[in-house]
């Protein structure tokens, strides 16, 4: 498994030179994260015009696609495909739109923000139409009520897209948090504790600190971790609070 910085596109490329068990892949990925400061420094020394922010955003986008298989002990291609609208959400949140695939993992999303927003809007519209089928009486009260319903729904969708699709900020602490995540992933791999509820909660906190609330939700779903019942521990109630972070991280 090779990690390359693409000079022309300023992005991270992950190349698999031979078959690896999912846990081996995550162990190597953890090594990259653990040494991300040195990796970035080496890139700058070789090419001082390299866009590190683009590189980091490409890394943030690709992480959940490569991590999920380890927790399910199965190659990524055997895990259910990620919905296009979720990829569009995550692309807008990370500020990165991959134009190609990485191995057998399809990372492609439309290049323009407008195209990605339209994917999300179509998803909302489809969900709305399904709900109308269940509650058809909403259509027959009055024209005024239906127009108000559509207007309210449209404003709500635009608000959700605007606030939930804001780009994750990159700051001086981003490299540190990525390194912390790498160190923690190595602990999970070495101990083979991928279904330990306390460690999953700590993993969630690490990811939350990197991606923020909306980005974390997309990350967790893309990695296909949102169905783990063991994540719902007593500590999870305090999951996003400073109390939990202080106690367990």
Curated annotation (Swiss-Prot):
Signal peptide: none
GO terms, biological process: symbiont-mediated suppression of host innate immune response; viral process
Pfam families: Luteo_PO (PF04662)
Superkingdom: Viruses
Cysteines engaged in disulfide bonds, as pairs: none
UniProt domain F-box-like: residue ranges: 63-67
Sorted UniProt keywords: Host-virus interaction, Inhibition of host innate immune response by virus, Suppressor of RNA silencing, Viral immunoevasion
Family as reported in the entry's similarity comment: Belongs to the polerovirus P0 protein family.
Function description: Suppressor of RNA-mediated gene silencing, also known as post-transcriptional gene silencing (PTGS), a mechanism of plant viral defense that limits the accumulation of viral RNAs. The P0 protein suppresses local PTGS using its F-box-like domain to mediate destabilization and degradation of the AGO1 protein.
Assembly with partners or alone: Interacts (via F-box-like domain) with host AGO1; this interaction targets AGO1 for degradation, and thereby suppresses the silencing function of the latter. Interacts (via F-box-like domain) with host ASK1 and ASK2 (SKP proteins); these interactions are essential for viral pathogenicity. Part of a SCF P0 complex composed of P0 and the host proteins SKP and CUL1.
Record protein name field: Suppressor of silencing P0
Organism, scientific name: Turnip yellows virus (isolate FL-1)
Species classification: Viruses, Riboviria, Orthornavirae, Pisuviricota, Pisoniviricetes
